[in-house]
Amino acid sequence: MNLDLDEKIAIVTGGASNIGRAICMNLAKEGAKVIVADLDTEQGQITSGAANQQYSGEVIFQQCDVTDTKSVKSLFEMTVGKYGAVDVLVNAVGWDELQYFTATEPNFWDKIIEINFKGVLNCSFEALKIMNTKGSGSIVSISSDASKQGEPREAVYGAMKAGVNSFMKTIAKENGRYGVRCNTVCPGVTIPEDDTEVGDNSMWKNIDSMFTQEQLAKIAKTLPLKKIGRPQDVANAVLFLASNKVAGHITGQVLSVSGGYSMV
């Protein structure tokens, strides 16, 4: 199916590894010009290089700290200066450590808030200014099913992702008149295919410390589809929502990609 993403300009934050990497590869495969935005320079360059080798789309890496407004502004200025527009923004940056709330400290909360929520605000703010002027655009934010269910050891993370869900609905209402669509994708437990998908800064770097294989097997049994999600599952949903051709009348939605864990 032609998604009409050829030559579209797409920024993917957190694009160096895991879900973000799969999203970048999907967009490049469709012929988009992709900016891999991430703190991890080494992994970001690996991702952009792999995409350029495999697909026809132009993929470049730009180091960016989504919690720093100057860094974010520089990312968007570079993109517009080089390509003249931003058609798609995917907010794929995310970070968490599984800890009970009473075992954490305020500096831990602040880090989760800065990366998972403020980062989405910073990037969406810059994107909307460009997209509203252009009269079209698509913003997709990666949230989590923890935002819907209230998961133990994810109190602050889940709360911030719930904030992302609400924020995306609101900007969908505010900016639809300019032709801009804003949607959210909520993965469940999603693990990389192998270590090559995981960067040093990824929350999945030490996956074995988060979930044992036995725990993952138990989680899979609770799901209607009986299997744990992979980055490509999430990336496929993002690709659909990014396309105005196939999702042009979809905005303000929160789509779970979790094997049926959440059906709300």
Segments the model singles out, each with a brief description of its role:
Residues L3-I35:
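Canonical Rossmann dinucleotide-binding motif of NAD(H)/NADP(H)-dependent dehydrogenases/reductases
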Residues D4, K227-V257, S262:
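C-terminal substrate-recognition "lid" of short-chain dehydrogenase/reductases
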Residues T102, Q149-A155, R177, K226:
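Active-site loop immediately N-terminal to the catalytic Tyr-X3-Lys motif
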Residues S124, M160:
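Active-site helix of classical SDR
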Residues K129, K173-E174:
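Alpha-helical segment proximal to the catalytic Tyr-Lys
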Residues S144:
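Residue(s) in the substrate-gating loop at a strand-loop-helix junction
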